[in-house]
Each structure stands twice: as C-alpha cells, then as structure tokens.
Amino acid sequence: MDAHTKTPTGPSRREVMKAMSLGVAMGTLASGSLVGAAPAAAQSSTGTNAGMGPLATRTLPRSGDTVPAIGLGTFLTFDRLPGAQRDDLREVIRTYWDGGARVIDTSPLYGTAEYCVGAFASSLGITDQVILSNKVWSTGEFAGDESHAIRSLEQSMGRLWRNQIDIMHCHSLTNVDNVVNILRAWKKEGQIRYVGVTHHENLYHDALASWIERDVVDFVQVNYSIFNRHAEERVLPAAAERGVGVLVNMPLEKARLHKVVEGRSLPDFAREFGAETWSQFFLKWVIANPAITCALPSTSNPDHARENIAALTGPLPDAAMRDRMVRHMETIPGFNDIAKMPWYPDKTYEGTIRRAQVNLRARS
C-alpha cells in the first residue's frame, strides 16, 4: 500500500492512550469497534500482550496519558536504498504493535526511515494510533525565520501521512534556542502535542537537564543503558522532579551489549524478574527506573523485535536487583570497554546514510 493512502478513521491517539490508562479493551470501546482496518492480532487488550499478562506502562505526568514502556527506534535500521527489499521492516513494526508497543521514534535525519514507518503503519492500518516521536533541527533563512522548520514538518507529515506529530524534538540540541520556541508555537497551534529535546552523548547531558529545568519541554530523549548510566546524575532526577517524560535512545548500546555477552548464558537470578533473553535482561533494567517513560531499542530483525517487546511483560527488577545486574555485567570481559566498540559490531546497514557517508569520504 502506498504510504500516502489514508487509513480508516478511528479514535484519536489521545483516546487510545486514555483507554490504556483505564484498562479499556483495545479492540472495543463503549461505542463499538475501535479500528476496523487494524490487524486482529493488534486488537489485544491495552495493558496486555496477547494474553501474556499486564504490560509495563508509564503515565505521562503532564497529560495523564499512558504509554507502554518499550517503543521502536529507527536510526540506521529502517534506512533502505530505494527499491531494496524491506518486508522485514514491516514485520518488525507488526511485531512491536502486536506485542503492545505504541511509540515509534524516527527523524528526517534517518534516511528513508520516515518513508518506511509511514508506508508500513498505513498498510497495517495503525497510522492514526501510533504515537510518533520525530525531530527537527533547521530554522530558516535568517534569525526568527522558521521557513526551513516548516518545510521539514510538512515533509515529515507527508511521509508519515499524519496531520499532527505527537512528540516533536529539537534534534541533538541543534539550534535549540530557536527550535524550542518554534516547537512551542506549533504545540499551541495543534500541529504537535509535545515539545522535546534530544541527544545521544554524555557531553550534552547537562544541557538537556538545563532545558528540563526551564519548564519549557514536555519530553527529553537521552542515551541510557546498563552500561552507560551517566543520565542518572542529573537528567533523570530533573525529569522526575519536573514531570518531564523520558525517552531512552541506545538502551542496547547499538548491539554492543549483545556482542559482549555473545555465547554466554543468562545468570540464574534473571529468572527472578522473568528475563529469558539478554534483550529482556538489558531492557528490563532500563525501564525499571521509574524516571523512564519509554525505551526505544532499534532493530531490523523480527526475531529480535519479539525479544525486545517481551521485556514489557513480567516483573521488573527492583533497585537492589538492578545493582546486582550491573555488578554481574562488570564481571564480563569487554563490558567496561563498550564505548570503544563500533556501533552494530559485525553488521553494516546499507542504506542512504551509508551511501552518502561513503561518497563523502571518497571525496574528502
């Protein structure tokens, strides 16, 4: 189905999230069917995963909306060259959706990721129910001009086939003083629902925290994992104090966590919080922090998607167990050197980003 095929009408994303917080069945509301075009498997109960029990959810402090604590990231993994096979990406989105995930994070910076998300959300009939997290970083031709930002917003809406973006971030704090003001105007005008700021490097955590402390953003997206716990120093406490939602990028350290545990069995104590795979082990550690709203692991592999989404079910580790998990990881060779490893070890994503980077390196 074309990415610009309008999905059938249904309840708004706000209604879906409110229904989740009330425990209302996702397949039906008092008035009847929710979304006729949604796959049957996607119409499981909100707050449950196809009969596997309650999902780990978080309530957004500034709205009362509730979201599942695992979503989908798309950097590199959803970037494909035009014409390349991408059925696996559709299956990843379907798997996440059927498993209860509702947040998908993307960006114009991510090559063809927006096209893929828009096309497959449309073909699955979930366009109007997905909670979209997106980004902008441009402003305009001169100080105070927002023409480039508006063009970026309109382009994203066209690719994703939406007339409103749920969470719009200033990407990597680029032009942040101007962009946040633009986002606040868009929120007031109804073009977006929430204002956010993002970064993926520890060096910028103080800057992220300062924006949280100004009380002008609703969300922050930050790197955080069992390996990289730097956000606990200032970003997460500030977000918890100010009622700001926290999206987590790099919760699996771009596959580097899996690399260091390759061939290793889970510790026996992982059974105490229902972890059956390393993905569950790492993701449950992240979302067990009460400051975290939603972790955004990325993958292009449907089997890995199933492992990731399984972290939504079962008990979460308490503070003492989380400390024990860290101590265990610190005994594994290579864990303390993860930052020195390349992203996605042993794997190359052949998309538009890589093609452009290779071409630029050849010319420079």
What are these regions (language model features)?
Residues D105-A121:
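Glycine-rich, proline-tolerant flexible connector loops at the mouths of alpha/beta enzymes
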Residues L60, L72, I104, V117, ...:
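Conserved, mostly hydrophobic/aromatic
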Residues Q43-G71:
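N-terminal amphipathic alpha-helix/helix-capping segment at the start of soluble metabolic enzymes
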Residues T139-H230, R234, A240-L247:
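Glycine/proline-rich, positively charged
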Residues G10-E15, M26-G47:
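N-terminal twin-arginine translocation
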Residues M26-S31, L60, R234-S364:
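Structured C-terminal cap/extension of enzyme domains
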Residues S63-R80, S133-V136:
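N-terminal small/glycine-rich loop or linker at the start of catalytic domains
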Residues M1-S12:
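N-terminal secretory signal peptides
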